[in-house]
Amino acid sequence: MTSGPYDHQVFDKIDLSEQTILKQEYQNCTFTNCNFSKTVFTNCSFIDCHFKDCNLSVVNFNNTGLKTVTFANCKLMGINFSHCNDFLFNVSFKDCQLDYSSFFKKKMQKTPFLQCSMKEVQFEQVDLTQAVFKDCNLMEASFTNTILEKADFRTASYYTIDPEMNKLKKAKFSQSGLAGLLAKYGIDIEF
């Protein structure tokens, strides 16, 4: 995995935890049951790649491109995605643990977050226009100066979003989620 470029390769049960990978390109590759915990990817590129059942906790994507990359049932805890290269940044998440991660200043329009744990995730100055948070746990996640226009929170839970600090035009919320929009006002809402 360190002497690429790699195209249409399948990587299964690879353990590169706490390793450093430099200037590698992976295109149309699949990673299954791999351990990349605390791995440092520097100046790498992942294009049209799929990660399934992988541990990527505390990975450092230092100036690394994630271009149309899907993560399914992966552990992605404590990742600072702001270190990723911004050019064509495009990711999707399903059944993932994203707790304690940060997406500072990322453009993530239409990003699907499906059935994810997102406890204490930081969204600051992020464009999440039309993003979908389907069945996500957003307990103590912070949204600061984000664009959430047309985002879908209808099945998300435990979120707190300040409407005065975020753009929410045409965002979708369920009636049960209204308390998360009014929390700062100390209003008791009963259903």
Predicted regions and their residues:
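Tandem repeat scaffolds
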Residues: 1-191
